[in-house]
A protein has these predicted regions:
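N-terminal amphipathic/basic-hydrophobic helices that include classical n-h-c signal peptides
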Residues: 1-13
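N-terminal intrinsically disordered, cationic/polar leader segments
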Residues: 12-162
Length: 162
């Protein structure tokens, strides 16, 4: 007869003993993200220079105001900042705030540009919205704002550059 000995503890058994009951777990140090229309800003680190900040937002969602069905869009935002830049996490939360809101494509696109202008007063902002196919029709909406008196520098084409 083989003498019995206790089985070694498995990683699963050890994890169960080490974990705390759900009602005794500590709250996270940073609260989880939540939708918000509050666009946070920070000082432009190079206000003396015109440069383009490009945001690619491939998963924007809102609701169709007529059917309540979700509408999806891919946004490309180009900004030439002046004194302020928009902080990306707050921009993510801002977009998230539209998730359960009903609005027409044109209204959403223009509202976002207006909110960005109000928050950072950029030299230039353009939002190109590629709304996914709905009823067999794909919609593209582009809205832009140019600060009065601002003139972009001429584009430089370099030989061999793509």
């Amino acid at each position: 007869m083989i003498p019995s000995r206790p089985l070694p503890a498995s990683p699963c058994t050890m994890a169960k003993k080490a974990s705390q009951p759900l009602n005794q777990r500590r709250a996270p140090a940073v609260p989880p993200s939540a939708p918000s229309r509050d666009l946070q800003v920070f000082p432009n680190p190079a206000p003396e220079r015109d440069y383009v900040i490009r945001f690619d937002v491939p998963e924007f969602t809102c609701l169709c105001p007529l059917t309540g069905q979700p509408d999806f869009a891919h946004f490309t935002i180009e900004i030439v900042a002046d004194k302020l830049c928009v902080e990306t996490k707050s921009l993510k939360q801002y977009f998230w705030s539209y998730r359960n809101e009903g609005a027409f494509h044109e209204k959403v696109t223009n509202s976002i540009v207006s909110d960005l202008v109000a928050a950072i007063q950029p030299r230039f902002v353009r939002l190109h919205a590629d709304w996914f196919v709905r009823g067999g029709i794909r919609t593209f909406v582009t809205a832009e704002h140019c600060k009065k008196g601002w003139k972009p520098a001429p584009k430089i084409e370099l030989p061999g550059a793509q």
